A protein has these predicted regions:
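Soluble extracytoplasmic regions of secretory-pathway and membrane proteins
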Residues: 3-4, 17-20, 24-43, 47-891, ...
Length: 920
């Protein structure tokens, strides 16, 4: 049955009503999202950050929308004004021109029925909205451009301050792209108007245009050539990121061929623009055709083909000679971009002079050699300390504390709540959002100690936390952590689960400062809409004092406040003054540093650890401390968000003792430094001294007998650097030559104030062979006693897990230590069973670190042969003290070990003096 004309009206009205409702829902969703964000930013004290961001987005959207819509509408209205009047285009004329008759009839009937002004205005508005929506993400780019600060160094080609490349050039490129979008949309709207009105006909060939359409097209083509000239001008600066030569950055061909060609193209594009505008009167199709061929033909021949031929035929045969200055630019600016130019290089003799006396003098280092790897320790924590299935240790952090036992490196992990681990029938809305709201407590272990069963010792354990020489914790609850997905509601009528106690549970009420008040019906409705969760509105457990906690995952929390910062992958827990805090390293990065080698992320080539973020695990307060005030990017953001950042000096003194050099940054710098320690262009070109990361054997059975090994990763340790007066917390990584396994250097990053952030490379003598980690691994595998013991364990149903091999610099020598774990084939509880130590040509394996060191240095102990009978008693006494020292060392009794060495020293000196007298 055919619909009557009148029956279409209700259908049309229904369609309009549905469209209006859908539009209102979309707008309402956007508005509620903005309101919720405003409430959250206000609740944490960063309303100023919110308004700066929102106003920047709104102003940019409005400006782009207004400009885009106006220009597109102007183009459309000009076409409407000068195009043929509807009905004036006769079908017969169209037929003679070769246009299909049905198209001619359709256009002739359609044109008079179109409300042209309304259609053009509507199209301009829609296109303007789409363009503005696409450009709104550039709000950060615009603010950085407007508030930029100079870098203080200039590029070697154009002499521009590097701040121009970090802030201005990306903005200019974004502006150019917007103008091209705008021009394209303007041309499309005008073409549609002219096409429907009959000003464009499609003959075979070519396309025939009316005088108005030809003039309009010439004008737009002239604008296109102006934009193309501007694009070529910007392309000059993009040569500094070219990656077609020996290194990243402009090379000999770029400077001597491509740069002059770009100047020629700028001139040609400008001339083509003028010719196009002159052609608005002549309207000769040959002018735009010739302009396009001239500009793009020249670009193809002289910007693509000619440079490639020049590079191959002229530059390649004399590449080193011609490219040397540009290689030097790349080396200098890459080192600057990654902070490699701040690395100090010091010699390391790599001597073989360690003995028990040396170990006692470096007792702080020995006491803090890490025997527990992260994964075995996390597995052990899970078995011993998770207490209930809904608790989870998500990571293990490494830090240092001044405890009763001294300056100790520790490993610690937060016991976080994982509601998803609750039984399926217990995952109710009340449990997930009102009852199970927080984790509880921390476990902390010394890195070197173990029990007789091979399990870790604990400084902190259990719920509530019990300290055994560890720091006291007054507030162990974690409402914010590395988990913390989803919202929770606190201060309601139902008490929150705190921790299990025997057969009963202990409950608590949140008394912190975080949260958005949701006591009113309006607020509850707002959040019910935002989270699509009507329970927030319907529940009786929400009271007038209730608050909702959002963004409880610490990285999500930081990113929401400061999305322009790049976050380190490993936030770590800090215990300070009885409270728990998260420390998050944050970076400023860029991909616009000229001549710098991309080294991470999306081709980023600049990085600074500019910010240390501290998050209170209970209150959720977030503080941003500027750790690199010389970084121009963070200085720019300080101008944009003056209330967001604090100086590092404002960080509480106790928290300052726990800042550490971030491992992600160190890894990036070490990766680049493998090549960029070579500062001579010829050496760099030939890759004569390329380094690489050492290999090691880790995991079950060391990865197998034929394993090629795993690249070593940086590790923290407490040690006394050469020529330094005291021990400190450092991050180190050994280096070996490319395709070789002997060690050539080790890189250290200092973590303790006031030397925080200083990088040092300790280089070994070129004429001395120092065993590298993989060579030590080979010697361990070749040790008959060790290999037989491992085979025996495997035959008994246990799995042997090789731990990381640690290179431990002590004084001017290198000691190697590696833990060995056993795990039942069907179990998940690794036990630290043996410690392997190597020094010089010796490799030993014992049950404890003390035992391994005692066995390793037993034969190299400084024993003296008495020259006379009167010295026999001294020699026997010295030997007795030495044997007791060894026993104390095996037992881990360092105080007894030190006392025996103190008693041994004068006896050895007396024996040495007696020998000297006898030899005279």
């Amino acid at each position: 049955m055919r619909l009557q004309p009148g029956s279409r009206v209700p259908f049309k009205r229904t369609g309009i009503a549905v469209a209006v409702v859908v539009g209102c829902l979309i707008v309402a969703g956007r508005i509620t999202g903005v309101v919720v964000d405003w409430l959250w930013f206000s609740s944490i004290g960063y309303a100023g950050v919110f308004w700066t961001t929102v106003s920047a987005k709104a102003l940019l959207f409005a400006a782009v929308f207004a400009a885009s819509s106006s220009v597109i509408a102007a183009s459309g209205f000009l076409a409407h004004r000068y195009a043929r009047r509807p009905g004036s285009w006769q079908v017969e004329t169209a037929r003679l021109s070769g246009t299909p008759e049905f198209i001619s009839e359709l256009a002739d009937q359609l044109a008079p029925r179109i409300p042209w002004r309304t259609s053009i205005a509507g199209s301009a508005i829609v296109l303007g909205l789409l363009i503005a929506a696409g450009q709104i993400s550039n709000w950060d780019l615009v603010l950085r451009f407007l508030h930029q600060v100079p870098y203080g160094e200039r590029d070697p080609v154009f002499g521009q301050d590097i701040g121009f490349y970090l802030f201005s050039l990306p903005a200019y490129l974004a502006f150019k792209n917007w103008l091209l979008q705008l021009l394209s949309c303007s041309a499309i709207v005008a073409a549609v108007v002219y096409g429907v009105r009959g000003d464009i006909t499609f003959e075979r060939p070519p396309c025939r245009l009316s005088a108005a359409a030809a003039a309009h097209g010439s004008a737009l083509l002239g604008v296109f050539f102006v934009l193309k000239a501007g694009s070529y001008a910007l392309d000059r600066f993009l040569l500094l990121y070219d990656d077609n030569g020996v290194v990243v950055g402009a090379g000999y061909t770029d400077i001597h061929v491509e740069l002059p060609v770009l100047w020629v193209l700028i001139g040609l594009a400008g001339a083509a623009a003028v010719a196009s505008w002159i052609n608005m009167r002549r309207r000769d199709y040959r002018v735009p055709a010739a302009s396009l061929v001239l500009v793009f033909g020249t670009s193809f021949v002289f910007a693509l083909i000619y440079p490639a031929l020049f590079q191959r035929l002229y530059v390649k045969p004399s590449e080193l000679q011609l490219e040397t200055p540009y290689i030097q630019h790349n080396i200098a600016l890459t080192r600057m971009a990654y902070g490699l130019n701040q690395i100090a290089v010091k010699p390391f003799p790599a001597e073989q002079e360690l003995n028990l006396t040396s170990l006692e003098a470096n007792r702080a280092t020995i006491d803090n050699i890490r025997l527990w790897d992260v994964q075995p320790l996390m597995d052990t924590y899970a078995q011993l300390q998770e207490i209930r299935t809904y608790y989870k240790f998500l990571s293990v952090d490494i830090d240092r504390y001044r405890l009763e036992a001294g300056y100790r490196q520790v490993m610690l992990s937060a016991r976080e709540l994982e509601p998803s681990m609750l039984p399926a029938n217990a995952q109710t809305w009340v449990n997930l959002h009102l009852l199970f709201t927080h984790g509880n407590g921390v476990v902390m272990s010394p890195v070197t100690e173990k029990s007789t069963e091979g399990l870790p010792s604990f400084y902190l354990q259990d719920i509530p936390p019990v300290a055994h020489g560890g720091p006291a914790i007054r507030e162990p609850r974690l409402y914010f952590g590395e988990g913390g997905e989803g919202y929770v509601i606190v201060k309601g009528s139902v008490a929150e689960f705190d921790y299990p106690k025997g057969k009963d549970n202990v409950y608590t009420k949140y008394s912190g400062s975080d949260g958005i008040a949701i006591g009113s019906t309006a607020r509850r409705s707002l959040f019910a809409w935002q989270f699509d969760d009507p329970n927030i509105l319907l529940t009786d457990y929400v009271t007038s004092t209730s608050r909702i906690l959002l963004h409880r995952n610490i990285q999500d929390r930081v990113r929401t406040i400061a999305p322009f910062l790049t976050l380190d992958r490993d936030p770590y827990l800090v215990i300070s003054n009885g409270r728990l805090f998260w420390m998050q390293d944050a970076y400023t990065t860029s991909r616009w540093f000229p001549y710098a080698q991309p080294g991470f992320g999306d081709d980023a080539n600049y990085i600074r650890n500019a910010v240390k973020v501290v998050i209170d695990a209970y209150n959720g307060t977030v503080y941003f401390y500027v750790s690199d005030p010389n970084d121009p990017i963070i200085r720019t953001y300080q101008r944009i968000f003056p209330s967001l950042f604090k100086s590092l000096a404002a960080m509480p003194a106790d928290l300052q003792q726990h800042i550490r050099y971030p491992e992600d940054l160190f890894q990036i710098q070490a990766q680049l430094y493998r090549a960029y320690h070579m500062d001579a262009a010829e050496v760099f070109y030939n890759r004569e001294d390329l380094w690489q990361f050492p290999r090691e054997l880790i995991g079950i059975d060391g990865g197998g007998g034929s394993s090629p090994g795993t690249p070593m990763t940086p590790y923290y340790m407490i040690m006394r650097l050469p020529d330094e007066p005291r021990e400190e917390f450092v991050l180190i990584l050994p280096m070996v030559p490319s395709q070789r396994d002997n060690m050539i250097a080790w890189l250290a990053a200092r973590c303790d104030p006031p030397n925080y952030g200083k990088l040092i490379v300790y280089a070994f003598p070129k004429d001395k062979l120092v065993y590298g980690p993989f060579q030590i691994e080979a010697r361990i595998q070749q040790n008959t006693e060790i290999s037989q013991q491992i085979s025996l364990w495997n035959q008994m149903g246990s799995r042997v897990i090789r731990g990381h091999l640690l290179v431990v610099p002590i004084e001017n020598s290198i000691l190697y230590v590696s833990p060995l774990y056993l795990r039942a084939e069907s179990g998940q509880l690794p036990e630290l069973k043996r410690v392997i130590a190597a020094y010089g040509d010796r490799v030993v394996m014992e049950e404890t670190l003390g035992g391994a060191l005692a066995a390793l240095f037993k034969e190299s102990a400084p024993l003296a042969s008495p020259p006379q009978g009167t010295a026999d008693a001294r020699a026997r006494e010295a030997l007795a003290h030495y044997n007791r020292a060894i026993e104390r060392l095996k037992a881990g009794d360092w105080s007894g070990f030190g006392a025996e060495l103190d008693a041994l020293r004068p006896l050895l000196e007396a024996l040495g003096g007696g020998r000297s007298e006898g030899q005279k």
